[in-house]
Amino acid sequence: MKKFLGFIAVLVLLCACSTQGDKQAKSGADSMEEVTVKYATGFSVRDSADIRLVDVGKKDHFALVHDEATVAPEGYVKVKVPIERTICMTSLQLSNFTILDAHDVVKGITGTKNLFNEDIKARVKDGRIVKIGMEGEFDPEVVMAANPDVIFISPSKRGGYDAIKEIGITLVPHLGYKELDPLGQAEWIKFIGMFIGKEKEAAEIFAGIESRYNELKEKAAKVEQRPTVTSGEMHYGNWHAVGGKNYLAQIFRDAGADYVINDDETSGEDLEFEKMYALSANADYWRILNSYQGDFSYEALKASEPRNEMFKAFKEKKVIYCNMKQTPYYEIAPVKPDVLLKDFVAIFHPELVEKDYQPTFYRLLQ
């Protein structure tokens, strides 16, 4: 009898351990990697039980869950994660998926006109990724065929999202383009990571970006001489001037230079040539980003606007240039602000980088 009772006790203990183990395993499977947001201002994260609450801007709220049966709090749109299929609307969004090695999740994009990424182009060619059309002209049937779990949208674009809403697909705003801090924009890889189950990978990748960026920023902060820099060029009678409260102006500051509109509190505005010249005539450097067909040159810059030769930076051959026809700027730069920063530091303060450094985006115009 004692032996029998002993056997029962052992059996009960084993069952209890097994049940506890199952609970722990289930808890581990359902748990979400912690996400900390340090620089980005466009989204915030709160974890509650088995629900992750993600607020995007002031109007959009999402409850990320592993179990479809989980009830989302009032005011939150439930999204079962990890998602397996999505559509990207911008190169910035696509850059997040690229750096996370998650092209398999992307089932649709707007188009391939200015696309550089060979893997994405191959997927479009063989049908794994479809082209849904440009903003305002989306093809609802193609969107439905892509069968996305969610669609990441950019409110800055022309829209056309109402037709997609009617299909019943969850639209998730991606506000990375609004970030004023370069690291804040890059941190949106954590946002995408939460939706595709790559929180850990996103955190590790971002930590590397952050470390490299801040290390170089600290070196540049110690320079004794800070050159001045202006940005942009004339288009259709106006010069779109980046404001002092802007992503690019912040990069200039972090690279050890002073932007000519450093005290402005706007992100950007269109100015007449005369006003921009008054601000920029004596700037040491002049940054230009465009999509010139062919090899851009000082001759081409003068041909586009004869008065350009009046700038000090033009005369001294200190124009900093990137051609988007030749460089996948918007496909890479949003998630590599550390590289972008290094390009500028290499020009402003070459002694702070290795002598054989080869720029990725910007270089002095020849």
Predicted regions and their residues:
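Proline-aspartate-enriched helix->loop->beta-strand connector
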Residues: 129-134, 139-156, 169, 273-287
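Bacterial Sec-exported substrate-binding components of ABC uptake systems
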Residues: 17-94, 201-230, 315, 328, ...
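Extracytoplasmic substrate-binding proteins
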Residues: 139, 145, 149-239, 262-263, ...
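Sec-dependent bacterial lipoprotein signal peptides
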Residues: 1-15
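A ligand-binding cleft/hinge motif common to bilobed small-molecule-binding domains
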Residues: 157-166, 290-302
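Flexible, glycine-rich surface segments
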Residues: 211, 216-300
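A short, structured surface patch at a secondary-structure boundary
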Residues: 52, 63-144, 150-152
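Short, structured coil segments at secondary-structure junctions
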Residues: 102, 167-170, 255, 315
